[in-house]
């Protein structure tokens, strides 16, 4: 009998322990009061997240990521048009505008009951205005990128063996200016400078892939069928960050190639093209510059890549377009990453100033929040 009672007690103890663990896990999964389970922001609102005194600035950034989650991660495909990429940029710009509006509400609440003549001296208003200025800059240039395309597919390529077409000059300038200003806004906000690509067209002393640059030819001969694989190899040797760095370090007025490319040839010059002989004249050009040129040609109005064979053959238009799409996506991810890092830094700075201002104030009652 004692053994049976002891066994029953042991089972009860085990059951109680299991129930306790389950309850603890369940409680741990519940969002804290005033927070959402995903973003960490109050009701998923960016402005409310910034007003959570003592909370990490990460909460505000998560609220921003939640706000733009239906836009981030856009990936171009073979049937994606350049205008559809523009739609992505316009949507991202609109989300940056929404974030700015959320921030404005923080300042409006901070000014409630305050003499408006002193509003310019309100530290919360100042913090919000500084953050909004950066978001406004990003929004403007992101939306500018929304206007650089046309109805042709991303990576548009010649459907037969033949040269390509340079990107429209006005739209190429607009793309260059927008990317340059987005990166400038990032570095001004404390984001680490972009990595500069040092890899040449003969990566690590290996295969010489200079003929891959011929898919950017706009005159002379067209690339050979085997050259397209070399273009893909050039692209795979660099990161999107290195491509973006090469583009923004170009000169707005860099010209189409009139002589053999070298280590100083910019992404803008490669995007504008030239003869196949000049494009593939040496293996010293930077791979990031060639890849950046391919990405720009693939995204900007009237840009068309050269092909080495009939559309569906090896080295033909479809294969070339695949390289163009991959280059475009690498660049898009890099731009998106820069924007996210910039917003994160801006929100951290605003949060720090807002917390400092609120910490020096009298506690605010729940009814007045």
UniProtKB/Swiss-Prot annotation:
It is a lipid-anchor. It comes from the Bacteria. GO terms for cellular component: cell outer membrane. A lipid is attached at residue 27 (S-diacylglycerol cysteine). Residues 1-26 form the signal peptide. InterPro entries: Borrelia_lipo. A lipid is attached at residue 27 (N-palmitoyl cysteine). Genes for both Vlp and Vsp families are on (usually) unnamed linear plasmids in B.hermsii HS1. Belongs to the variable large protein (Vlp) family. Alpha subfamily. The Vlp and Vsp proteins are antigenically distinct proteins, only one vlp or vsp gene is transcriptionally active at any one time. Switching between these genes is a mechanism of host immune response evasion. This is Variable large protein 7.
